[in-house]
Amino acid sequence: MTKRLKMIGRVKELEILSNACDKKTSQLIAVYGRRRIGKTYLINHMFSEHKKECSFFRFTGSYMLDSSTQKDNFIEAIHDWFKEEPTTSIENWMSAFNFLKRTIQKLQNQNQKIVIFLDEVPWIDKKNNGGFIGALGHFWNEFALNTNNIVLILCGSNSSWIKEKIFEDSSGPLYQRLDIKIHLKPFDLKETKEYLLKEKKFIIDDKTIAETYMIFGGVAKYLSLLDSSKTIAANIDELIFNSDGHLNKEYSEVLKSLFDTKASYYSSIIEILSSKQSGMTQTKIAEALGEKSGSKIKDAMEELSEAGFIVGLSKLHSKINTNYIICDPFVLFYNKWVRAFSKNELISLQKPYFSTIMGTQSYAIWSGFAFEILCLSNIDLYLQTRMTKGLAKNYGYWIFPGNENDSGAQIDFIVEYENSVYDIVECKFYNKEFIISKEYKENILHKIEMFKKYALKGKYDIKLIMLTTYGCEKNSHYNSLNIAQDIDLGSLL
């Protein structure tokens, strides 16, 4: 495909989908990722704007319905799209997919590509009590694979379900059958800027774009709700700090829809992590919950990671001590500033509320941490700016607790490259050029010395990187440090 498909972001994904439709064999595709990031929009856009010649069938699972009712809705969807009625009673999912097969066989143009888009697949038959997966597998293995014109797209927000039931179940009918996996992620900071300026028509600077990202992340649905006739702060008040705001109950609704009966337990884990900005190990989280570090907490951490809510950062040169932090900006913001309010308390809040907290010391401290999360979440943009993308081996954190000879040190963001090169990255969110003081300089030098002494053996080449809002003031302390690169937001964007 030579023509670029116009859409903010998603260029690679659109190319993949377009090429799949051009294949001379049937294709089985899985699209998964966090809720609200635009998975459904991506598929609909592809086949309404760029592959209109395909015959397109869509069915969406419903969160609250049982498998039998969903099966009835599936039959109704076939009728709506293809105008076909079953001639016999459809009692189970196997019969339902056989009806879909016969409907496809009746189509006049047998060479036309037929796209079957099953959205929110994890909701269709959550526990597989109705035999949905077996019937789907039979449909694919016995019918679709033997044609050359079917593109079957399985889509869902519950990434752990998709991986467990589709990717990793060696006894399942779709094991190793997938042709394409698309793990859709939120917009990065650059794509968020493009969306806000081009799609939403905001006229705002890079710092305001970063602040918007630090609250909403690159989640397309959240960004689409912003009104450019209002300030970002006014939008936040209306959407989040309003008891009837569109996003006021979003956090609990997302957890419930993804984790069902486990939502409360998972929320407790997130609440614990939100109180510890430096992060916690799985063992420490279990202790805070009053339980042992076993399979229950392990499974929970994996599911929260798959959902994109938390990330485990490895201590450099260590296979243990994975440190978990909240990496989803909206989840981080909600748990810090919104979760504690009851509905009545939200109603009685002084309005505008968000503007009143923006100037507080508490907000400044939180913003500094949220900016670190922004930087970690946009590691690819960082590496592009450093022109080192193909060389990076690993990134994470490093901590030295201290001993009788040396005081402790912690590096929150460090990138390891080939040939023993290391970026020590200092992330600072500031309202103007960041000023390096004597105390700050000495702290950085101590970190570097401890890293050299306790983390490195043999050759090394350490680069100190400043990543700040507006860059650093070039004072004597700045000049006395060997700063390899002074990166501001404009450089990332």
What does each model-identified segment do?
Residues 42, 46:
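Hydrophobic positions on the alpha1 helix immediately C-terminal to the Walker A/P-loop
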Residues 54-87, 333:
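Conserved NTP-binding/hydrolysis module of P-loop NTPases
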Residues 456-493:
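Domain-level recognition of nuclease-like catalytic cores that cleave nucleotide substrates
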Residues 123-124, 128, 132, 136-171:
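Sensor-1/coupling segment of RecA-like P-loop NTPase cores
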Residues 221-222, 226-410:
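Accessory nucleic acid-recognition modules appended to NTPase machines
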Residues 180-207:
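Conserved small helical "lid"/interfacial subdomain of P-loop NTPases
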Residues 39:
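Conserved lysine of the Walker
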Residues 379, 411-431, 444, 464:
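Conserved catalytic cores of phosphodiester-cleaving nucleases, focusing on short active-site segments
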